[in-house]
Amino acid sequence: MDIEMAKEPVNPTDTPDIEVTPGLCQPLRRRFRRFVTAKQLYECLRPVFHVTYIHGLTSFYISCDTKTGKKAIKKTIFGYINGIMHIAMFVFAYSLTIYNNCESVASYFFRSRITYFGDLMQIVSGFIGVTVIYLTAFVPNHRLERCLQKFHTMDVQLQTVGVKIMYSKVLRFSYMVLISMFLVNVLFTGGTFSVLYSSEVAPTMALHFTFLIQHTVIAIAIALFSCFTYLVEMRLVMVNKVLKNLAHQWDTRSLKAVNQKQRSLQCLDSFSMYTIVTKDPAEIIQESMEIHHLICEAAATANKYFTYQLLTIISIAFLIIVFDAYYVLETLLGKSKRESKFKTVEFVTFFSCQMILYLIAIISIVEGSNRAIKKSEKTGGIVHSLLNKTKSAEVKEKLQQFSMQLMHLKINFTAAGLFNIDRTLYFTISGALTTYLIILLQFTSNSPNNGYGNGSSCCETFNNMTNHTL
Protein backbone atom coordinates (compact mmCIF):
# COMPACT_ATOMS: atom_id res chain seq x y z
CA MET A 1 0.00 0.00 0.00
CA ASP A 2 1.33 3.39 -1.04
CA ILE A 3 1.34 6.24 1.44
CA GLU A 4 1.29 9.85 0.24
CA MET A 5 3.73 12.22 1.85
CA ALA A 6 2.70 15.75 2.78
CA LYS A 7 3.72 18.25 0.13
CA GLU A 8 3.98 21.20 2.48
CA PRO A 9 5.54 21.13 5.96
CA VAL A 10 3.18 21.68 8.87
CA ASN A 11 3.61 24.88 10.80
CA PRO A 12 4.17 24.08 14.51
CA THR A 13 2.09 27.09 15.53
CA ASP A 14 -1.01 25.62 13.82
CA THR A 15 -1.13 22.55 16.10
CA PRO A 16 -2.57 22.81 19.64
CA ASP A 17 -0.33 22.14 22.61
CA ILE A 18 -1.28 19.06 24.65
CA GLU A 19 0.03 18.81 28.19
CA VAL A 20 0.44 15.29 29.51
CA THR A 21 0.83 15.00 33.25
CA PRO A 22 0.71 11.29 34.03
CA GLY A 23 2.66 11.84 37.22
CA LEU A 24 -0.21 13.78 38.79
CA CYS A 25 -3.25 11.71 37.76
CA GLN A 26 -1.96 8.20 38.36
CA PRO A 27 -0.86 8.63 42.00
CA LEU A 28 -4.21 10.24 42.84
CA ARG A 29 -6.10 7.39 41.20
CA ARG A 30 -3.99 4.83 43.02
CA ARG A 31 -4.56 6.51 46.36
CA PHE A 32 -8.29 6.72 45.72
CA ARG A 33 -8.41 3.04 44.75
CA ARG A 34 -6.53 2.08 47.88
CA PHE A 35 -8.97 4.18 49.87
CA VAL A 36 -12.07 2.39 48.51
CA THR A 37 -10.76 -1.16 47.98
CA ALA A 38 -10.22 -3.93 50.51
CA LYS A 39 -8.99 -7.52 50.22
CA GLN A 40 -9.43 -8.71 53.80
CA LEU A 41 -12.22 -8.79 56.38
CA TYR A 42 -10.43 -6.60 58.91
CA GLU A 43 -9.42 -4.16 56.20
CA CYS A 44 -13.01 -3.45 55.15
CA LEU A 45 -13.97 -2.66 58.77
CA ARG A 46 -10.89 -0.55 59.48
CA PRO A 47 -12.61 2.90 59.21
CA VAL A 48 -15.41 1.93 61.60
CA PHE A 49 -13.07 0.57 64.25
CA HIS A 50 -10.80 3.60 63.99
CA VAL A 51 -13.80 5.81 64.80
CA THR A 52 -14.92 3.61 67.70
CA TYR A 53 -11.34 3.50 69.02
CA ILE A 54 -10.97 7.28 68.95
CA HIS A 55 -14.30 7.80 70.76
CA GLY A 56 -13.48 5.20 73.42
CA LEU A 57 -16.14 2.65 72.43
CA THR A 58 -13.58 -0.09 71.71
CA SER A 59 -10.20 -0.82 73.25
CA PHE A 60 -8.71 -2.04 69.95
CA TYR A 61 -8.26 -0.95 66.37
CA ILE A 62 -7.30 -2.62 63.08
CA SER A 63 -3.53 -2.49 62.57
CA CYS A 64 -1.55 -3.28 59.42
CA ASP A 65 1.63 -5.36 59.32
CA THR A 66 4.13 -3.46 57.16
CA LYS A 67 5.94 -6.66 56.09
CA THR A 68 3.04 -8.95 55.17
CA GLY A 69 0.32 -6.32 54.66
CA LYS A 70 -2.15 -8.32 56.76
CA LYS A 71 -4.68 -6.53 58.97
CA ALA A 72 -5.32 -7.70 62.53
CA ILE A 73 -6.89 -6.57 65.80
CA LYS A 74 -4.51 -4.71 68.09
CA LYS A 75 -5.35 -3.91 71.70
CA THR A 76 -3.61 -1.03 73.48
CA ILE A 77 -3.49 0.36 76.99
CA PHE A 78 -4.48 3.74 75.55
CA GLY A 79 -7.74 2.16 74.35
CA TYR A 80 -8.75 1.30 77.91
CA ILE A 81 -7.62 4.68 79.28
CA ASN A 82 -9.40 6.51 76.46
CA GLY A 83 -12.68 4.71 77.19
CA ILE A 84 -12.50 5.46 80.91
CA MET A 85 -11.66 9.12 80.21
CA HIS A 86 -14.65 9.49 77.87
CA ILE A 87 -17.00 8.03 80.49
CA ALA A 88 -15.55 10.28 83.23
CA MET A 89 -15.82 13.42 81.06
CA PHE A 90 -19.37 12.56 80.09
CA VAL A 91 -20.45 12.01 83.72
CA PHE A 92 -18.81 15.29 84.76
CA ALA A 93 -20.47 17.27 81.95
CA TYR A 94 -23.90 15.81 82.69
CA SER A 95 -23.47 16.59 86.39
CA LEU A 96 -22.76 20.21 85.46
CA THR A 97 -25.91 20.45 83.34
CA ILE A 98 -28.01 19.13 86.24
CA TYR A 99 -26.25 21.55 88.60
CA ASN A 100 -26.95 24.42 86.18
CA ASN A 101 -30.69 24.26 86.84
CA CYS A 102 -31.27 21.10 84.74
CA GLU A 103 -30.03 22.84 81.60
CA SER A 104 -31.06 21.40 78.24
CA VAL A 105 -31.41 22.69 74.69
CA ALA A 106 -35.19 22.15 74.74
CA SER A 107 -35.55 24.31 77.86
CA TYR A 108 -34.27 27.35 75.92
CA PHE A 109 -37.01 26.88 73.34
CA PHE A 110 -39.94 26.05 75.59
CA ARG A 111 -40.85 26.58 79.26
CA SER A 112 -43.81 24.86 80.90
CA ARG A 113 -44.54 22.44 83.69
CA ILE A 114 -44.62 19.55 81.26
CA THR A 115 -41.36 20.62 79.65
CA TYR A 116 -39.72 20.67 83.08
CA PHE A 117 -40.66 17.03 83.42
CA GLY A 118 -39.67 16.32 79.82
CA ASP A 119 -36.28 18.02 80.22
CA LEU A 120 -35.56 16.10 83.39
CA MET A 121 -36.56 12.83 81.74
CA GLN A 122 -34.36 13.54 78.71
CA ILE A 123 -31.39 14.50 80.88
CA VAL A 124 -31.71 11.39 83.04
CA SER A 125 -32.33 9.08 80.07
CA GLY A 126 -29.45 10.65 78.14
CA PHE A 127 -27.11 10.26 81.10
CA ILE A 128 -28.11 6.65 81.74
CA GLY A 129 -28.31 5.85 78.03
CA VAL A 130 -24.88 7.05 76.97
CA THR A 131 -23.30 5.50 80.07
CA VAL A 132 -24.93 2.16 79.25
CA ILE A 133 -23.80 2.41 75.61
CA TYR A 134 -20.21 3.07 76.68
CA LEU A 135 -20.15 0.28 79.26
CA THR A 136 -21.88 -2.33 77.06
CA ALA A 137 -19.67 -1.42 74.10
CA PHE A 138 -16.40 -1.10 76.00
CA VAL A 139 -16.53 -3.98 78.51
CA PRO A 140 -17.65 -6.97 76.34
CA ASN A 141 -15.18 -6.34 73.50
CA HIS A 142 -14.36 -10.06 73.48
CA ARG A 143 -17.79 -10.76 71.93
CA LEU A 144 -17.00 -8.40 69.10
CA GLU A 145 -13.66 -10.12 68.49
CA ARG A 146 -15.31 -13.54 68.61
CA CYS A 147 -17.90 -12.40 66.07
CA LEU A 148 -15.16 -11.20 63.71
CA GLN A 149 -13.34 -14.53 64.05
CA LYS A 150 -16.53 -16.36 63.05
CA PHE A 151 -16.88 -14.16 59.98
CA HIS A 152 -13.28 -14.91 59.04
CA THR A 153 -13.85 -18.66 59.42
CA MET A 154 -16.97 -18.66 57.26
CA ASP A 155 -15.20 -16.59 54.59
CA VAL A 156 -12.54 -19.29 54.33
CA GLN A 157 -15.26 -21.93 53.94
CA LEU A 158 -17.11 -19.84 51.37
CA GLN A 159 -14.00 -19.94 49.18
CA THR A 160 -14.20 -23.74 49.16
CA VAL A 161 -17.59 -23.58 47.40
CA GLY A 162 -16.34 -21.10 44.84
CA VAL A 163 -17.14 -17.75 46.42
CA LYS A 164 -14.60 -14.96 46.42
CA ILE A 165 -15.87 -12.20 48.69
CA MET A 166 -15.82 -8.60 47.53
CA TYR A 167 -14.69 -6.82 50.69
CA SER A 168 -14.58 -3.49 48.85
CA LYS A 169 -18.38 -3.44 48.88
CA VAL A 170 -18.38 -3.61 52.70
CA LEU A 171 -15.70 -0.92 52.89
CA ARG A 172 -17.73 1.46 50.72
CA PHE A 173 -20.85 0.72 52.75
CA SER A 174 -19.01 1.57 55.98
CA TYR A 175 -17.76 4.83 54.45
CA MET A 176 -21.29 5.70 53.33
CA VAL A 177 -22.79 5.02 56.77
CA LEU A 178 -20.09 6.93 58.66
CA ILE A 179 -20.16 9.95 56.34
CA SER A 180 -23.96 10.17 56.32
CA MET A 181 -24.15 9.88 60.13
CA PHE A 182 -21.41 12.49 60.49
CA LEU A 183 -23.10 14.96 58.12
CA VAL A 184 -26.51 14.60 59.77
CA ASN A 185 -24.99 15.04 63.22
CA VAL A 186 -22.92 18.09 62.24
CA LEU A 187 -25.79 19.79 60.41
CA PHE A 188 -28.25 19.24 63.25
CA THR A 189 -25.82 20.31 66.00
CA GLY A 190 -24.54 23.32 64.07
CA GLY A 191 -28.05 24.42 63.12
CA THR A 192 -29.31 24.10 66.69
CA PHE A 193 -26.59 26.17 68.32
CA SER A 194 -26.59 28.75 65.51
CA VAL A 195 -30.30 29.36 66.20
CA LEU A 196 -29.57 29.70 69.92
CA TYR A 197 -26.72 32.16 69.40
CA SER A 198 -28.72 34.18 66.86
CA SER A 199 -31.32 34.78 69.59
CA GLU A 200 -28.61 35.89 72.05
CA VAL A 201 -28.78 32.68 74.08
CA ALA A 202 -25.44 31.38 75.35
CA PRO A 203 -25.51 27.71 76.46
CA THR A 204 -22.76 26.47 78.75
CA MET A 205 -19.83 24.39 77.50
CA ALA A 206 -21.17 21.43 79.47
CA LEU A 207 -24.39 21.54 77.44
CA HIS A 208 -22.38 21.76 74.21
CA PHE A 209 -20.43 18.65 75.19
CA THR A 210 -23.39 16.56 76.38
CA PHE A 211 -25.55 17.50 73.38
CA LEU A 212 -22.79 16.63 70.91
CA ILE A 213 -21.53 13.47 72.62
CA GLN A 214 -25.02 12.00 72.99
CA HIS A 215 -25.79 12.24 69.28
CA THR A 216 -22.26 11.19 68.29
CA VAL A 217 -22.19 8.05 70.44
CA ILE A 218 -25.65 6.99 69.25
CA ALA A 219 -24.64 7.56 65.61
CA ILE A 220 -21.42 5.52 65.98
CA ALA A 221 -23.24 2.64 67.70
CA ILE A 222 -25.84 2.57 64.90
CA ALA A 223 -23.11 2.67 62.23
CA LEU A 224 -21.28 -0.28 63.80
CA PHE A 225 -24.52 -2.27 64.12
CA SER A 226 -25.42 -1.50 60.49
CA CYS A 227 -22.03 -2.78 59.29
CA PHE A 228 -22.40 -6.06 61.19
CA THR A 229 -25.95 -6.67 59.96
CA TYR A 230 -24.68 -5.96 56.44
CA LEU A 231 -21.96 -8.60 56.90
CA VAL A 232 -24.61 -11.11 57.98
CA GLU A 233 -26.87 -10.15 55.07
CA MET A 234 -24.04 -10.50 52.51
CA ARG A 235 -23.10 -14.00 53.62
CA LEU A 236 -26.71 -15.16 53.64
CA VAL A 237 -27.03 -13.88 50.07
CA MET A 238 -23.90 -15.85 49.13
CA VAL A 239 -25.23 -19.09 50.62
CA ASN A 240 -28.57 -18.59 48.88
CA LYS A 241 -26.77 -17.97 45.57
CA VAL A 242 -24.77 -21.19 45.94
CA LEU A 243 -27.97 -23.18 46.54
CA LYS A 244 -29.83 -21.40 43.72
CA ASN A 245 -26.98 -22.17 41.34
CA LEU A 246 -27.18 -25.82 42.33
CA ALA A 247 -30.93 -25.83 41.63
CA HIS A 248 -30.33 -24.14 38.28
CA GLN A 249 -27.80 -26.82 37.31
CA TRP A 250 -30.31 -29.54 38.13
CA ASP A 251 -32.91 -27.81 35.99
CA THR A 252 -30.62 -27.47 32.97
CA ARG A 253 -28.90 -30.85 33.14
CA SER A 254 -30.27 -34.36 32.93
CA LEU A 255 -31.21 -36.28 36.05
CA LYS A 256 -28.20 -38.55 35.58
CA ALA A 257 -25.88 -35.62 36.14
CA VAL A 258 -27.13 -35.17 39.69
CA ASN A 259 -24.85 -37.93 41.01
CA GLN A 260 -21.85 -36.72 39.02
CA LYS A 261 -19.26 -34.12 39.84
CA GLN A 262 -20.38 -30.68 38.72
CA ARG A 263 -19.53 -27.05 38.94
CA SER A 264 -20.74 -25.44 42.11
CA LEU A 265 -20.67 -21.80 41.14
CA GLN A 266 -20.45 -19.64 38.04
CA CYS A 267 -20.95 -16.07 39.20
CA LEU A 268 -22.34 -14.37 42.28
CA ASP A 269 -23.08 -10.85 41.03
CA SER A 270 -21.20 -8.21 43.04
CA PHE A 271 -20.33 -10.62 45.86
CA SER A 272 -17.90 -12.87 44.00
CA MET A 273 -15.50 -13.29 41.12
CA TYR A 274 -15.88 -15.82 38.28
CA THR A 275 -14.66 -19.07 39.82
CA ILE A 276 -15.01 -22.71 38.88
CA VAL A 277 -14.90 -25.34 41.62
CA THR A 278 -15.58 -29.04 41.02
CA LYS A 279 -17.52 -30.57 43.90
CA ASP A 280 -20.15 -33.17 44.63
CA PRO A 281 -23.65 -31.76 45.38
CA ALA A 282 -23.69 -33.47 48.79
CA GLU A 283 -20.40 -31.75 49.68
CA ILE A 284 -21.74 -28.39 48.53
CA ILE A 285 -24.85 -28.76 50.70
CA GLN A 286 -22.78 -29.92 53.69
CA GLU A 287 -20.45 -26.94 53.42
CA SER A 288 -23.38 -24.56 52.89
CA MET A 289 -24.97 -26.00 56.03
CA GLU A 290 -21.79 -25.41 58.03
CA ILE A 291 -21.51 -21.85 56.71
CA HIS A 292 -25.15 -21.18 57.61
CA HIS A 293 -24.47 -22.46 61.13
CA LEU A 294 -21.52 -20.07 61.46
CA ILE A 295 -23.64 -17.17 60.17
CA CYS A 296 -26.28 -17.88 62.83
CA GLU A 297 -23.61 -18.08 65.53
CA ALA A 298 -22.05 -14.81 64.39
CA ALA A 299 -25.46 -13.10 64.34
CA ALA A 300 -26.25 -14.42 67.85
CA THR A 301 -22.88 -13.18 69.15
CA ALA A 302 -23.43 -9.77 67.55
CA ASN A 303 -26.91 -9.62 69.10
CA LYS A 304 -25.45 -10.31 72.56
CA TYR A 305 -23.00 -7.46 72.06
CA PHE A 306 -25.49 -4.90 70.71
CA THR A 307 -28.64 -5.92 72.62
CA TYR A 308 -28.43 -3.40 75.49
CA GLN A 309 -27.13 -0.67 73.20
CA LEU A 310 -30.15 -1.12 70.92
CA LEU A 311 -32.54 -1.10 73.88
CA THR A 312 -30.99 2.13 75.15
CA ILE A 313 -31.01 3.89 71.77
CA ILE A 314 -34.60 2.92 70.98
CA SER A 315 -35.77 3.96 74.47
CA ILE A 316 -34.08 7.38 74.24
CA ALA A 317 -35.40 7.87 70.71
CA PHE A 318 -38.96 6.98 71.73
CA LEU A 319 -38.90 9.34 74.72
CA ILE A 320 -37.58 12.26 72.67
CA ILE A 321 -40.03 11.61 69.82
CA VAL A 322 -42.99 11.61 72.25
CA PHE A 323 -42.12 14.96 73.83
CA ASP A 324 -41.04 16.59 70.55
CA ALA A 325 -44.27 15.53 68.86
CA TYR A 326 -46.22 16.91 71.83
CA TYR A 327 -44.41 20.28 71.70
CA VAL A 328 -45.00 20.60 67.94
CA LEU A 329 -48.67 19.62 68.16
CA GLU A 330 -49.33 22.02 71.02
CA THR A 331 -47.82 24.87 69.04
CA LEU A 332 -49.49 24.06 65.72
CA LEU A 333 -52.89 23.57 67.36
CA GLY A 334 -52.54 26.98 68.99
CA LYS A 335 -53.03 25.73 72.55
CA SER A 336 -49.63 26.82 73.84
CA LYS A 337 -48.99 30.13 75.53
CA ARG A 338 -45.27 29.81 75.58
CA GLU A 339 -42.87 32.54 76.59
CA SER A 340 -39.83 32.27 74.36
CA LYS A 341 -37.36 34.40 72.43
CA PHE A 342 -37.79 32.19 69.40
CA LYS A 343 -40.29 32.45 66.58
CA THR A 344 -42.84 29.73 65.95
CA VAL A 345 -41.01 28.66 62.78
CA GLU A 346 -37.70 28.22 64.62
CA PHE A 347 -39.46 26.40 67.45
CA VAL A 348 -41.30 23.95 65.20
CA THR A 349 -38.24 23.43 62.97
CA PHE A 350 -35.96 22.50 65.87
CA PHE A 351 -38.29 19.97 67.47
CA SER A 352 -39.34 18.54 64.09
CA CYS A 353 -35.69 18.07 63.05
CA GLN A 354 -34.83 16.44 66.37
CA MET A 355 -37.83 14.13 65.99
CA ILE A 356 -36.80 13.22 62.43
CA LEU A 357 -33.21 12.61 63.59
CA TYR A 358 -34.30 9.97 66.10
CA LEU A 359 -36.80 8.51 63.64
CA ILE A 360 -33.87 7.98 61.27
CA ALA A 361 -31.99 6.27 64.11
CA ILE A 362 -34.86 3.82 64.70
CA ILE A 363 -35.35 3.19 60.97
CA SER A 364 -31.61 2.52 60.48
CA ILE A 365 -31.63 -0.08 63.26
CA VAL A 366 -34.86 -1.77 62.18
CA GLU A 367 -34.09 -1.87 58.45
CA GLY A 368 -30.57 -3.25 58.95
CA SER A 369 -31.94 -6.03 61.15
CA ASN A 370 -34.96 -6.68 58.92
CA ARG A 371 -32.86 -7.10 55.75
CA ALA A 372 -30.74 -9.80 57.39
CA ILE A 373 -33.82 -11.59 58.74
CA LYS A 374 -35.57 -11.56 55.34
CA LYS A 375 -32.49 -12.98 53.61
CA SER A 376 -32.33 -15.81 56.16
CA GLU A 377 -36.00 -16.65 55.58
CA LYS A 378 -35.33 -17.22 51.86
CA THR A 379 -32.89 -20.05 52.57
CA GLY A 380 -35.65 -22.41 53.71
CA GLY A 381 -37.58 -22.07 50.46
CA ILE A 382 -34.48 -22.77 48.37
CA VAL A 383 -33.58 -25.86 50.43
CA HIS A 384 -37.08 -27.33 50.07
CA SER A 385 -37.00 -26.59 46.34
CA LEU A 386 -33.80 -28.63 46.09
CA LEU A 387 -35.38 -31.36 48.21
CA ASN A 388 -38.22 -31.72 45.72
CA LYS A 389 -35.87 -31.91 42.73
CA THR A 390 -33.19 -34.33 43.91
CA LYS A 391 -33.31 -38.09 43.28
CA SER A 392 -30.14 -38.94 45.18
CA ALA A 393 -30.63 -40.51 48.62
CA GLU A 394 -27.39 -38.98 49.94
CA VAL A 395 -28.26 -35.48 48.75
CA LYS A 396 -31.82 -35.83 50.07
CA GLU A 397 -30.49 -36.78 53.51
CA LYS A 398 -28.20 -33.73 53.56
CA LEU A 399 -31.07 -31.46 52.54
CA GLN A 400 -33.29 -32.89 55.29
CA GLN A 401 -30.54 -32.17 57.82
CA PHE A 402 -30.29 -28.64 56.44
CA SER A 403 -34.07 -28.25 56.77
CA MET A 404 -33.94 -29.35 60.43
CA GLN A 405 -31.12 -26.89 61.06
CA LEU A 406 -33.17 -24.05 59.58
CA MET A 407 -36.02 -24.89 61.96
CA HIS A 408 -33.82 -24.68 65.06
CA LEU A 409 -31.36 -21.95 64.02
CA LYS A 410 -33.00 -18.67 63.11
CA ILE A 411 -31.52 -15.21 62.87
CA ASN A 412 -33.22 -12.56 64.97
CA PHE A 413 -32.18 -9.41 66.78
CA THR A 414 -33.77 -8.36 70.06
CA ALA A 415 -33.45 -5.49 72.51
CA ALA A 416 -32.39 -7.35 75.67
CA GLY A 417 -35.06 -9.97 74.87
CA LEU A 418 -37.87 -7.47 75.53
CA PHE A 419 -38.97 -7.08 71.91
CA ASN A 420 -37.84 -8.15 68.45
CA ILE A 421 -36.15 -5.62 66.20
CA ASP A 422 -38.03 -5.93 62.92
CA ARG A 423 -40.72 -3.99 61.08
CA THR A 424 -43.36 -4.92 63.64
CA LEU A 425 -41.58 -2.43 65.90
CA TYR A 426 -42.94 0.42 63.74
CA PHE A 427 -46.51 -0.53 64.62
CA THR A 428 -45.66 -0.93 68.32
CA ILE A 429 -43.97 2.47 68.51
CA SER A 430 -46.73 4.26 66.58
CA GLY A 431 -49.39 2.79 68.88
CA ALA A 432 -47.51 3.72 72.05
CA LEU A 433 -46.73 7.19 70.64
CA THR A 434 -50.41 7.86 69.93
CA THR A 435 -51.40 6.75 73.44
CA TYR A 436 -48.86 8.97 75.21
CA LEU A 437 -49.65 11.97 73.01
CA ILE A 438 -53.36 11.71 73.87
CA ILE A 439 -52.49 11.51 77.59
CA LEU A 440 -50.22 14.58 77.40
CA LEU A 441 -52.76 16.61 75.41
CA GLN A 442 -55.54 15.74 77.86
CA PHE A 443 -53.31 16.63 80.79
CA THR A 444 -52.59 20.02 79.22
CA SER A 445 -56.24 20.79 78.45
CA ASN A 446 -57.36 19.87 81.99
CA SER A 447 -54.66 21.88 83.78
CA PRO A 448 -55.75 25.32 85.18
CA ASN A 449 -53.24 27.40 83.23
CA ASN A 450 -53.06 25.07 80.25
CA GLY A 451 -49.83 23.78 81.72
CA TYR A 452 -47.88 26.91 80.86
CA GLY A 453 -46.49 29.79 82.68
CA ASN A 454 -43.32 31.11 84.10
CA GLY A 455 -42.94 28.63 86.97
CA SER A 456 -39.71 27.46 88.47
CA SER A 457 -37.45 24.85 87.05
CA CYS A 458 -37.80 21.16 87.77
CA CYS A 459 -34.77 21.21 90.06
CA GLU A 460 -36.05 24.23 92.02
CA THR A 461 -39.48 22.64 92.41
CA PHE A 462 -37.89 19.48 93.75
CA ASN A 463 -35.80 21.49 96.23
CA ASN A 464 -38.85 23.45 97.44
CA MET A 465 -40.80 20.23 97.99
CA THR A 466 -37.90 18.78 99.96
CA ASN A 467 -37.56 21.89 102.16
CA HIS A 468 -41.30 21.97 102.83
CA THR A 469 -41.24 18.32 103.91
CA LEU A 470 -38.35 18.95 106.26
From Swiss-Prot:
TM segment ranges: 77-97, 120-140, 176-196, 205-225, 310-330, 347-367, 424-444
Superkingdom classification of source: Eukaryota
Topology feature Extracellular, residues: 98-119, 197-204, 331-346, 445-470
Cell division is among the record's keywords: no
Keywords annotated in UniProt: Cell membrane, Glycoprotein, Membrane, Receptor, Transducer, Transmembrane, Transmembrane helix
Carbohydrate attachment residues: 454, 464, 467
First-listed, main subcellular location of the protein, grouped into a coarse class: membrane
Membrane-protein topology: Multi-pass membrane protein
Stated role: Probable gustatory receptor which mediates acceptance or avoidance behavior, depending on its substrates. Atypical expression also suggests nongustatory roles in the nervous system and tissues involved in proprioception, hygroreception, and other sensory modalities. It is also possible that it has chemosensory roles in the detection of internal ligands.
Family per similarity comment: Belongs to the insect chemoreceptor superfamily. Gustatory receptor (GR) family. Gr66a subfamily.
UniProt-recorded name of the protein: Putative gustatory receptor 28b
Organism: Drosophila melanogaster (Fruit fly)
